[in-house]
Amino acid sequence: MAGEFRWQAGRPATAQVGGWVLAHCQQRFLQDDNGLLFPREWLKRQELPLLAEHGVGHWQGEPVYVLELDEPIELPGMAWAPLRQFMLHGDFDQFCMLGYASQIGIWARHNRFCGNCGTRMQAQDHERVMQCPQCGLHQYPRLSPSMIVLVTRGDEVLLARSPRFVPGVYSTLAGFVEAGESVEQCVVREVREEVGVEVANLEYIGSQNWPFPHSLMLGFHAEYVSGEIVPQEDEIEDAQWFSLDALPPLPAQRSIARHLIDLYLARRSGAAEPVLPG
């Protein structure tokens, strides 16, 4: 976080009065000309399709809550903005706040009823958990660990693109950790599945919260060992070796994918190493 700690995650009690509130639905936030934070009591007086309310932390010392709405209704003078645009542009502290609020909102939406007996779940005061009053099932906010890796071969990097990417952009390889495997095993497996090559000498670089919708990206560098590139059908549109002096359009600066690439470039050139945002 930034040095002034403008945003701090937490659990301010919903029973207390006042504070700021964010309105969230489908990974979008309500905003007007003054921004995304609204006076809490005022916004709650509007006719909103409210599913849940949770305290999410403090912004500049003031409590912040998120209202999870059933649908993104229209309100005069307001519009809905996607979370991803705040990742790419603007204040990074604000993005951290929105990312956390989005994850809590989605968790609240998906756990309104017990998956075991169907009883309505209840939020608990002592920790961030939804509990079933009937059978006692606990549901904590979901976190999905994913690996992301830059595969290198000297002055070349292996980059790929998914059909879902912005046209022309190539990125590092990524995939979810499966049950029963370590993150390192996931790296080797995903690289083999997505592009058909073998890697070794894995180096853990760092992690980044990725609230789309609830991933934790664990970044690695890996060295190429053997194999020819064979893109995975339906997952990888194209994959190539790129020279460091002839790279294609790359992911956004704030992403861990871009950090892995920039870090390798810095190490090969002897330049100062970049710092991973967050």
UniProtKB/Swiss-Prot annotation:
- Answer whether the UniProt record assigns the keyword Aminoacyl-tRNA synthetase to this protein: no
GO MF annotations, alphabetized: hydrolase activity; magnesium ion binding; manganese ion binding; NAD+ diphosphatase activity; NADH pyrophosphatase activity; RNA NAD-cap (NMN-forming) hydrolase activity; zinc ion binding
Cofactor info, note text: Divalent metal cations. Mg(2+) or Mn(2+). Binds 1 zinc ion per subunit.
**All copies of domain Nudix hydrolase, residue ranges:** 141-265
Q: Where is this motif: Nudix box?
A: 175-196
Annotated positions binding a divalent metal cation 2: 190
Q: How does it assemble?
A: Homodimer.
**Which function does this protein serve?**
mRNA decapping enzyme that specifically removes the nicotinamide adenine dinucleotide (NAD) cap from a subset of mRNAs by hydrolyzing the diphosphate linkage to produce nicotinamide mononucleotide (NMN) and 5' monophosphate mRNA. The NAD-cap is present at the 5'-end of some mRNAs and stabilizes RNA against 5'-processing. Has preference for mRNAs with a 5'-end purine. Catalyzes the hydrolysis of a broad range of dinucleotide pyrophosphates.
Can you name this protein?
Answer: NAD-capped RNA hydrolase NudC
Q: Which organism's genome codes for this protein?
A: Pseudomonas aeruginosa (strain ATCC 15692 / DSM 22644 / CIP 104116 / JCM 14847 / LMG 12228 / 1C / PRS 101 / PAO1)
From the broadest rank down, the organism's phylogenetic lineage runs: Bacteria, Pseudomonadati, Pseudomonadota, Gammaproteobacteria, Pseudomonadales
- Designated gene of the protein: nudC
